[in-house]
Amino acid sequence: MPVLDGNFEAFVTNLGKYNEGMLVGEWVKLPTTEEEMQKVFERIGIGKQDEFGQPYEEWFITDYECPIYGVQNMLGEYESLDKLNYLAALIDELSLSDQEKLVAIMEAGCDEVSDIDDLINLTFNLDCYDIMPGINDESDLGYYYAHEAGIYSEKDLGPLANYIDYERYGRDIAMDEQGRFTDEGYVRVASERWDRQFDGELDDIPDEYRITGSGEAAERDSTIAVLVVEPGKEPYVKE
């Protein structure tokens, strides 16, 4: 089963209504589409006018649901919906094994990850970590290295294998590798050279992942139309 499976959600709230003492919002399942997001905005009153004729233009996020350990604690009230959607889509597009790897890395605690930009970059850097399924404690790790990793052979160990303190051996290995144990198995860093493909700029999010307005729409909105009136000529619009 996919890790998210429709369970990455954000409660998008009308900020203007909230400041008036009303909680008007809706749970949004991520990833979603720009069309669906616009429907949500309409339902929660974004774009509509208040009693003074001023439009409700701002929103914020009052709650999250995410099945991946630690993710909710890294997300704030004013996160970009485009970034959130990009993150959810990137996770959904991972293979099932890579999704499980991501879960294990987050459960182990990833020093490189502290915010949504880091989470996005983590999806591009899963090969920087090794996951060893079925190894859940120091004793498992010590036994694996002694018998299965090829460091020692059963023949070489002989009866000495009965006297090995696998737990202590595994503890020393985990300390040397800075590895951690999770429900998914043992997690260790394979490479410290992260490739930061996403620098946090919204312009770097591909249009297909944007849900608050595509790049083309933003470009159209930024165009200024000027009515030019010249003596003896018909007025005309210049962009």
Predicted regions and their residues:
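N-terminal ordered "arm"
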Residues: M1-D50
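Long, highly charged low-complexity segments enriched in Glu/Asp and Lys/Arg with interspersed Ser/Thr
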Residues: R171-A217
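Structured domain cores in non-transmembrane regions
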Residues: E35-I116
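Extracytoplasmic/secretory-pathway segments with low complexity and glycosylation-like composition
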Residues: V103, G109-A149
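Short, flexible beta-strand-to-coil junctions
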Residues: T13-N19, D63-C66, A190
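Non-Sec secretion/translocation targeting segments of pathogen effectors
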Residues: D165, S214-E239
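Acidic, low-complexity, intrinsically disordered interaction modules
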Residues: N136-D183, A190
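Surface-exposed polar/charged interaction patches
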Residues: G47, L90-S97, A108, L122-Y129, ...
